[in-house]
Amino acid sequence: AATIDRAVDIYAEMLARDDVTNLFGLAGAMVPTGMRAIVADLIRDGHIDALVTTGANLTHDAIEAIGGKHHHGRADPHDPHPAGDDGGGGGSGTAREHDETLRDEGVDRIYNVYLPQEHFALFESHLRDNVFPTVERRVSIQEFTSALGRANAAQNEERDVDEDSGIAAAAYENDVPIYCPAI
C-alpha cells in the first residue's frame, strides 16, 4: 500500500508540472481486453504526451473504431467461469479441440477474448481504402499513425459506430505522437 501511495504522489506531481513529458507505454493485448477507452480518455484529458504501443494494439483499436467487436468468454472449454458468468460448468473436449473448432468457425482467440477473422479483412480494407491513399510516399511512423487515427475517426463517424473512435483517433485529434516499432 505504501508503494501505491508513493506512486500516486509521483503521478500527481507529474501531472501538475508543465515541464514534464508524459510517455505512456501500452504493450500486451490491452485493447482486446478492454483498456481502449481508458487510454483514449487519458489522451483526450491531456495526461499522455506521447504513446508507445504495439502494432497489435493499433490493429485492434482500428478494428473497434470501424465497427468490429471483441467478445469475451471462456479461455478454453474447461474454464468454468466465462467472462460475466458467476458459475456454470465448462464445455467438453480439449483445449486443442476448442482452438480447432474456433479455427474452423473463422474465429481468433486471445486467451478468453474472441474476434471473428472477418474483422481482420475489414481492417485490411480500411487500410487500403482510407489510410494508404493518404500516405502515397514513404512516411514516418508518426505520420502513418496520424493518418490511421484520422481515418479511424472519419470511418467511426461515417458508419455511426457505437464504440468510441479510439486511441489512434484521440492521438490524432490531440496532436499526441504514437511510436510503434512494429510499423
Model region roles, listed by residue range:
Residues 132-138:
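Short, compositionally biased low-complexity segments
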Residues 1-121, 125, 133, 144-162, ...:
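Metallocofactor- and cofactor-centric catalytic cores in central/energy metabolism, strongly enriched
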